């Protein structure tokens, strides 16, 4: 990876991708979960108040020399909740070793994948009754959240608070929520953040009973279309092991990665 610890431009060789803009998009998405508290500057962090690590954490600290102090601040600001520290191409080189030295353990990594939006992907065949809809209204948003939270394995009982945080995001003007709907019921989800010239694609989830039927491909193709309709140049996402082959088939290539750290249990 090409680090850009000062927030300046960092280009992935051979792809023409500005990683600084990709990570700015990802930071916007994650910081948008900071309903209880968020901070930017010496420590970019977000606290949703939800008792699940996906929605509390640290996105970066700009200085390698300040990692120890930043880790102490993160422990204080995120106390009482599970959280993750995301180490990506916008983090100073050497951050993983410093986090380990200050007691955090590595959980794993996720690839960062991108593709240009100068052409759209083929969605493939879909069930005749499957529709892609933009999510509007509190009832549909609640169903949307229930669908992806169940797929993510988030503990039950958090859906109402998650929907509240989603509805109150300060960047909702940049957000497009797309649902795969079959017979009136949401069976798949994705969220697009159209910002910093990129369509960040998040929360691509399909209900367990409808997987391996092409729904994820249809959703991702719709997300690409939404990004291009909003004038974005590239699409970017963080891929799970199960999703990476699907995204490669849609023209995405891996340009970097995020490494995830957490406090020991």
Task: Label the predicted regions.
Residues 99, 247, 252:
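Conserved active-site tyrosine of GNAT-family acetyltransferases
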Residues 137-150:
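A short, well-structured alpha-helix characteristic of acyl/acetyltransferase catalytic modules
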Residues 53-63, 197-208:
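Conserved acetyl-CoA binding element of GNAT-fold acetyltransferases
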Residues 67-75, 203-208, 212-225, 229, ...:
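Conserved acetyl-CoA-binding loop-helix of GNAT-fold acetyltransferases
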Residues 63-139, 239, 261-263:
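Acyl-donor-binding surface of acyltransferase catalytic domains
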Residues 157-207:
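A conserved beta-strand-loop-helix scaffold within acyl/acetyltransferase catalytic domains
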Residues 36-40, 91, 97-102, 174-190:
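Conserved beta-hairpin
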Residues 1-80, 91:
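N-terminal charged segments
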